[in-house]
Protein backbone atom coordinates (compact mmCIF):
# COMPACT_ATOMS: atom_id res chain seq x y z
CA UNK A 1 0.00 0.00 0.00
CA UNK A 2 2.26 2.75 -1.23
CA UNK A 3 0.06 5.21 -3.05
CA UNK A 4 0.77 8.75 -1.82
CA UNK A 5 -1.26 11.95 -1.77
CA UNK A 6 0.16 15.40 -1.06
CA UNK A 7 -1.96 17.64 1.17
CA UNK A 8 -0.75 20.96 2.52
CA UNK A 9 2.81 20.23 1.45
CA UNK A 10 2.87 16.85 3.24
CA UNK A 11 2.86 13.52 1.42
CA UNK A 12 0.32 11.27 3.11
CA UNK A 13 -0.15 7.53 2.61
CA UNK A 14 -3.27 6.53 0.71
CA UNK A 15 -4.03 3.76 3.20
CA UNK A 16 -1.80 1.83 5.58
CA UNK A 17 -2.08 -1.23 7.78
CA UNK A 18 -2.07 0.88 10.96
CA UNK A 19 -5.20 2.64 9.65
CA UNK A 20 -6.88 -0.74 9.22
CA UNK A 21 -5.79 -1.83 12.71
CA UNK A 22 -7.28 1.35 14.11
CA UNK A 23 -10.58 0.81 12.27
CA UNK A 24 -10.74 -2.83 13.34
CA UNK A 25 -10.09 -1.80 16.93
CA UNK A 26 -12.92 0.71 17.10
CA UNK A 27 -15.26 -1.66 18.92
CA UNK A 28 -13.02 -1.45 21.96
CA UNK A 29 -12.82 2.31 21.91
CA UNK A 30 -16.03 2.82 23.86
CA UNK A 31 -14.53 0.77 26.71
CA UNK A 32 -11.17 2.45 27.17
CA UNK A 33 -10.73 4.88 24.23
CA UNK A 34 -7.46 3.35 23.13
CA UNK A 35 -6.85 1.31 19.98
CA UNK A 36 -5.49 -1.60 22.00
CA UNK A 37 -2.03 -2.10 20.51
CA UNK A 38 -0.10 0.31 22.74
CA UNK A 39 0.24 3.08 20.16
CA UNK A 40 -0.91 5.80 22.57
CA UNK A 41 1.85 5.13 25.10
CA UNK A 42 4.32 4.66 22.24
CA UNK A 43 3.40 8.11 20.96
CA UNK A 44 4.06 9.71 24.34
CA UNK A 45 7.46 8.03 24.57
CA UNK A 46 8.28 9.11 21.01
CA UNK A 47 7.40 12.75 21.68
CA UNK A 48 9.44 12.87 24.88
CA UNK A 49 12.40 11.28 23.11
CA UNK A 50 12.35 13.24 19.85
CA UNK A 51 10.75 16.66 20.44
CA UNK A 52 12.81 19.43 22.01
CA UNK A 53 11.47 20.25 25.50
CA UNK A 54 9.41 23.42 25.50
CA UNK A 55 9.04 23.52 21.71
CA UNK A 56 5.32 23.47 20.85
CA UNK A 57 5.80 23.45 17.08
CA UNK A 58 8.28 20.60 17.37
CA UNK A 59 5.86 18.53 19.47
CA UNK A 60 3.13 18.90 16.83
CA UNK A 61 5.56 18.02 14.04
CA UNK A 62 6.84 14.94 15.86
CA UNK A 63 3.29 13.69 16.45
CA UNK A 64 2.39 14.18 12.79
CA UNK A 65 5.53 12.35 11.69
CA UNK A 66 4.78 9.48 14.09
CA UNK A 67 1.28 9.18 12.65
CA UNK A 68 2.52 9.19 9.06
CA UNK A 69 5.51 6.88 9.48
CA UNK A 70 4.57 4.58 12.39
CA UNK A 71 1.00 4.39 13.69
CA UNK A 72 -2.07 6.39 12.75
CA UNK A 73 -3.72 7.99 15.77
CA UNK A 74 -7.25 9.26 16.34
CA UNK A 75 -5.99 12.83 16.34
CA UNK A 76 -7.72 15.49 14.29
CA UNK A 77 -4.53 15.31 12.17
CA UNK A 78 -2.69 17.89 10.13
CA UNK A 79 -5.22 18.33 7.29
CA UNK A 80 -8.25 18.82 9.55
CA UNK A 81 -6.03 20.50 12.12
CA UNK A 82 -5.68 23.47 9.80
CA UNK A 83 -9.48 23.87 9.80
CA UNK A 84 -9.38 23.89 13.60
CA UNK A 85 -6.50 26.37 13.67
CA UNK A 86 -8.31 28.83 11.41
CA UNK A 87 -11.53 28.58 13.42
CA UNK A 88 -9.74 29.35 16.69
CA UNK A 89 -7.92 32.27 15.10
CA UNK A 90 -11.19 33.73 13.76
CA UNK A 91 -12.99 33.49 17.09
CA UNK A 92 -10.05 34.53 19.31
CA UNK A 93 -11.70 32.79 22.27
CA UNK A 94 -11.18 33.51 25.93
CA UNK A 95 -12.63 30.17 27.11
CA UNK A 96 -12.36 26.91 25.15
CA UNK A 97 -13.87 23.50 25.87
CA UNK A 98 -12.77 20.25 24.23
CA UNK A 99 -14.76 17.02 24.45
CA UNK A 100 -12.30 14.20 23.85
CA UNK A 101 -8.67 14.90 24.74
CA UNK A 102 -7.24 11.60 23.48
CA UNK A 103 -3.44 12.16 23.52
CA UNK A 104 -3.58 15.95 23.54
CA UNK A 105 -2.81 16.75 19.90
CA UNK A 106 -5.73 19.15 19.34
CA UNK A 107 -4.87 20.88 22.58
CA UNK A 108 -1.36 21.53 21.29
CA UNK A 109 -2.73 23.01 18.08
CA UNK A 110 -5.16 25.25 19.93
CA UNK A 111 -2.50 26.37 22.42
CA UNK A 112 -0.45 27.56 19.46
CA UNK A 113 -3.18 29.86 18.10
CA UNK A 114 -5.43 30.78 21.03
CA UNK A 115 -4.94 34.20 22.64
CA UNK A 116 -2.50 34.70 25.48
CA UNK A 117 -4.38 34.28 28.72
CA UNK A 118 -7.15 32.15 27.20
CA UNK A 119 -8.45 29.29 29.35
CA UNK A 120 -8.68 25.78 27.88
CA UNK A 121 -10.38 22.80 29.49
CA UNK A 122 -10.54 19.34 27.89
CA UNK A 123 -12.82 16.52 29.07
CA UNK A 124 -11.47 12.97 28.65
CA UNK A 125 -13.20 9.71 29.60
CA UNK A 126 -9.97 7.67 29.86
CA UNK A 127 -7.59 8.35 32.78
CA UNK A 128 -4.78 6.73 30.75
CA UNK A 129 -5.31 9.11 27.84
CA UNK A 130 -5.53 12.08 30.20
CA UNK A 131 -2.16 11.13 31.71
CA UNK A 132 -0.57 10.85 28.26
CA UNK A 133 -1.93 14.26 27.26
CA UNK A 134 -0.61 15.89 30.43
CA UNK A 135 2.87 14.47 29.84
CA UNK A 136 2.94 15.61 26.22
CA UNK A 137 1.63 19.07 27.09
CA UNK A 138 4.18 19.48 29.88
CA UNK A 139 7.00 18.43 27.55
CA UNK A 140 5.81 20.92 24.93
CA UNK A 141 5.82 23.71 27.51
CA UNK A 142 2.06 24.32 27.59
CA UNK A 143 1.04 22.24 30.59
CA UNK A 144 0.18 25.41 32.50
CA UNK A 145 -2.17 26.61 29.74
CA UNK A 146 -4.13 23.40 29.10
CA UNK A 147 -6.23 21.49 31.62
CA UNK A 148 -7.68 17.99 31.26
CA UNK A 149 -10.53 16.75 33.45
CA UNK A 150 -11.33 13.04 33.60
CA UNK A 151 -15.06 12.55 33.17
CA UNK A 152 -17.87 13.19 30.70
CA UNK A 153 -20.73 15.64 30.35
CA UNK A 154 -23.12 12.70 30.58
CA UNK A 155 -21.96 11.41 33.97
CA UNK A 156 -24.97 12.66 35.89
CA UNK A 157 -23.76 16.21 36.42
CA UNK A 158 -20.45 15.68 38.25
CA UNK A 159 -18.24 16.96 35.43
CA UNK A 160 -20.57 19.85 34.62
CA UNK A 161 -20.49 20.85 38.29
CA UNK A 162 -16.67 20.79 38.26
CA UNK A 163 -16.56 22.95 35.15
CA UNK A 164 -18.81 25.51 36.82
CA UNK A 165 -17.26 25.50 40.29
CA UNK A 166 -13.58 24.99 39.49
CA UNK A 167 -13.09 26.33 35.97
CA UNK A 168 -15.44 29.28 35.75
CA UNK A 169 -18.00 28.04 33.24
CA UNK A 170 -20.89 30.50 33.49
CA UNK A 171 -23.86 31.69 31.45
CA UNK A 172 -22.60 32.99 28.11
CA UNK A 173 -18.96 32.43 29.03
CA UNK A 174 -17.96 29.74 26.51
CA UNK A 175 -16.52 31.07 23.25
CA UNK A 176 -15.30 27.93 21.50
CA UNK A 177 -15.85 24.18 21.75
CA UNK A 178 -14.38 21.15 19.98
CA UNK A 179 -16.38 17.93 19.81
CA UNK A 180 -14.23 14.87 19.09
CA UNK A 181 -15.22 12.04 21.45
CA UNK A 182 -17.91 9.34 21.40
CA UNK A 183 -19.84 10.03 18.19
CA UNK A 184 -23.13 8.96 19.80
CA UNK A 185 -22.58 11.62 22.46
CA UNK A 186 -22.12 14.53 20.04
CA UNK A 187 -25.75 15.64 20.01
CA UNK A 188 -26.59 14.84 23.66
CA UNK A 189 -23.52 16.76 24.81
CA UNK A 190 -24.26 19.73 22.55
CA UNK A 191 -27.76 19.81 24.02
CA UNK A 192 -26.27 19.68 27.54
CA UNK A 193 -24.04 22.65 26.71
CA UNK A 194 -27.05 24.57 25.42
CA UNK A 195 -29.12 23.72 28.52
CA UNK A 196 -26.32 25.03 30.72
CA UNK A 197 -26.50 28.32 28.76
CA UNK A 198 -22.73 28.45 28.42
CA UNK A 199 -22.90 29.64 24.82
CA UNK A 200 -23.47 33.16 23.56
CA UNK A 201 -24.30 34.41 20.06
CA UNK A 202 -21.05 34.05 18.14
CA UNK A 203 -19.78 31.02 20.05
CA UNK A 204 -18.38 28.38 17.68
CA UNK A 205 -18.49 24.59 17.94
CA UNK A 206 -16.20 22.49 15.71
CA UNK A 207 -17.02 18.79 15.34
CA UNK A 208 -14.65 16.20 13.85
CA UNK A 209 -15.48 12.84 12.22
CA UNK A 210 -19.05 13.79 11.36
CA UNK A 211 -18.95 11.65 8.20
CA UNK A 212 -16.61 8.89 9.43
CA UNK A 213 -17.12 7.16 11.79
CA UNK A 214 -20.10 9.50 11.60
CA UNK A 215 -22.46 11.51 13.79
CA UNK A 216 -25.67 11.52 11.70
CA UNK A 217 -27.99 12.70 14.49
CA UNK A 218 -25.70 15.64 15.25
CA UNK A 219 -25.53 16.62 11.59
CA UNK A 220 -29.30 16.26 11.13
CA UNK A 221 -29.94 18.48 14.16
CA UNK A 222 -27.71 21.24 12.84
CA UNK A 223 -29.34 21.00 9.42
CA UNK A 224 -32.75 21.37 11.04
CA UNK A 225 -31.58 24.37 13.08
CA UNK A 226 -29.74 26.07 10.20
CA UNK A 227 -30.43 29.81 10.26
CA UNK A 228 -32.50 29.48 13.43
CA UNK A 229 -30.13 28.73 16.31
CA UNK A 230 -27.04 27.66 14.33
CA UNK A 231 -25.18 28.58 11.17
CA UNK A 232 -22.96 25.72 9.97
CA UNK A 233 -20.14 25.33 7.45
CA UNK A 234 -19.37 21.77 6.34
CA UNK A 235 -15.72 21.19 5.47
CA UNK A 236 -15.11 18.25 3.11
CA UNK A 237 -11.91 16.54 4.17
CA UNK A 238 -10.38 13.13 4.92
CA UNK A 239 -10.04 10.81 7.87
CA UNK A 240 -6.76 11.64 9.56
CA UNK A 241 -3.43 10.82 7.95
CA UNK A 242 -4.72 9.10 4.80
CA UNK A 243 -6.57 9.99 1.62
CA UNK A 244 -9.01 7.14 0.95
CA UNK A 245 -11.69 7.62 3.61
CA UNK A 246 -13.55 10.93 3.33
CA UNK A 247 -14.72 12.86 6.36
CA UNK A 248 -16.58 16.03 7.35
CA UNK A 249 -15.69 18.69 9.88
CA UNK A 250 -18.63 20.86 10.92
CA UNK A 251 -17.97 24.42 12.06
CA UNK A 252 -21.12 25.80 13.67
CA UNK A 253 -21.76 29.32 14.95
CA UNK A 254 -24.38 29.71 17.66
CA UNK A 255 -26.96 32.36 16.80
CA UNK A 256 -28.78 32.38 20.12
CA UNK A 257 -32.18 31.03 21.03
CA UNK A 258 -35.00 32.38 18.86
CA UNK A 259 -37.29 34.91 20.47
Q: Predicted regions span which residues?
A:
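Active-site segment flanking the S-adenosylmethionine/decSAM binding pocket
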Residues: 146-213
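Conserved class I S-adenosyl-L-methionine
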Residues: 58-69
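C-terminal substrate-binding/active-site "lid" region of AdoMet-derived donor-dependent transferases
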Residues: 4, 183-259
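Hydrophobic packing residues within well-ordered alpha-helices of enzyme cores
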Residues: 110, 133, 137, 160, ...
Amino acid sequence: MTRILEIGGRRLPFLRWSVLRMLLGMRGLTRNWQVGDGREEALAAHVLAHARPGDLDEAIRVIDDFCVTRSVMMNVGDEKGEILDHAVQRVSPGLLLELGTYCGYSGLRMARVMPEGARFCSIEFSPANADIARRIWAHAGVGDRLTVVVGSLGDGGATIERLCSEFGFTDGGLDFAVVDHDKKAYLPDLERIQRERWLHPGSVVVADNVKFPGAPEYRAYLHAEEGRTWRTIEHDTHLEYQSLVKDLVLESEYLGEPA
